[in-house]
Structure formats: structure tokens, C-alpha cells
Amino acid sequence: MNWILTMSLTACLHHTWFIKPIPFQSLIINKACHARISPRIVAALIATESGFNRNAVRYEKRVNDYSVGLMQIRMGTAKMLGYTGSLRKLKLPWVNIYYGTRYLKNCLVRYPNNWDGIVAYNQGRPLWDDERNRYILPNGRPQHYANIVQGKLLKITSPSY
């Protein structure tokens, strides 16, 4: 079983979320547990994607779309998940985290390696590399993004954060 999904059950049942408060903590816990994803992973992803900046906006040239809000969700991705609102509304933290966690859950279920799912959240569908026996980013680089998220995860769950 996917350890991120298993970790979510433990975190949501035992309320072992964060050692210190983080921005949007209750919202992250609520939406992550609803999607059955570890709140810690969602928080690490938000720290990586937007640095907890609810107004973050980035133009994605390769797909001609904007990534917005805490989880840097693209309008096209949100629409794929059933979103019908405006770009402005998608930046609202509760809306952004709701659609971001839904998309992350899809990625984690689709890819057998947790970190491949994390990479898929950021890069879109990764490519399978038979030589490495794992997924790689579309541009051929190793999964540096997953390492960044993992580093943020360690930071937000350590007492010195």
C-alpha cells in the first residue's frame, strides 16, 4: 500500500500532524484528511509550491495556463476535476486546497512510487524509464522536485521548524 496514503490514516486518526503551528493548518488538515492524504505531505507541497503564499500566481508557458494559490493548481487541472468557478475564486485557500488535494490524491493513486506521484503533481504525467525502473520528468532530469518536497516535509515535522 502507498505509504503516503497509509500515513494519512495514522495522521488523521491520531491527530499527529505538526510539531509547531503552520499557516492554514486547520484547513490543510481538514482537506487532506478528507482526501485521505497525509496533512504533512500537503503542507510540504504547499511550502514547496507557494511558500504558503495564498496569492501566488505563476504563468506556465509550456501549457499556456496559470498556476495559482497555495497549491499552485492550474485552472485546466481544476476544471478537469469539475471546477466551474473563476481564476480568482480558485485562489481562495479552501478552494485551492480542496482541488489541490484531489489532484494530488489522483497522482498518488496513479503512480506506484509515492515520489513519482509528487512529481506528477508538479510536472504532469512523468515518463517511465526502463533503465532506471522508475518515472522521470518529461525533460529527462532526475526527480529533483520530489527531493525538495521531502526536504520541506522534514523541516515542517522537525522541532526546530
Where are these regions (language model features)?
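Catalytic glycan-binding domains that act on GlcNAc-containing polysaccharides
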Residues: 12-161
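Sec-dependent signal peptide recognition
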Residues: 1-8
